[in-house]
Amino acid sequence: EMCIRDRLVNSHLDRFALSEANVETYRTPEYMLSSVQDYRPGAPGYQQHIWQATLGNRAIVYTNHPGGKNLKYSPNYWAGNEILPRAAQHKNVVVCIYNIPENQKNDYTHAYFPKNDFDEVLTKGNWTFGRKKDGYVALYSQNATTYQAGERGDICDLLALGRQNIWICETGTKTEWGDFTKFVNAISSAKVSCQELNVNYTSPSIGNVTFGWQSPFTIKGKEQELRWKY
């Protein structure tokens, strides 16, 4: 059944149109994790900010598919997305899948993860970890990542080459985990299996997570609703 919104807005033709956004936010005293669920995946983007982990005023983490280097326009290197991903969140875990078509010149995705704004940052395997006071964040990239300097010279740009990529973000706290090292070791040793545009991740905190470009979002085998029912 087609709703009025679907008849009026073609997300692949009108990147400026406003459409329904199902936002999920999970907040503790140490961090906030927020995302928009299954928002026009594969469609051209504009200024949409799909997800973000916030551990402080400047200690933030998010990913995007850049639209260009010129920061005066949107989408640009840091603001918005040239092609929108498919994202889903349950509590403290976000999965974000990018599927960039061949006709797009920017064949990579990247994360904003500013080293100097965290108290600790380290890399272990495909994971990058950060600590800000008693808040912890972990970011996984299916594709290999390299850190590079941003336009102001600060090391904040975590680049991942490839048109298809799966990113996972998990957050935690000292209260839950104790030492930051325990958080790092538990998540870096957790099972992550990526096949094409599907992922199976065994989160140490919420259990088994599965998601795909065309597959449902499940937690411990139970499908999760990505569109709110009013």
Regions found by a protein language model. Give the residues of each.
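Ser/Thr/Asn(+Pro)-rich, low-complexity disordered segments
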Residues: 1, 5-230
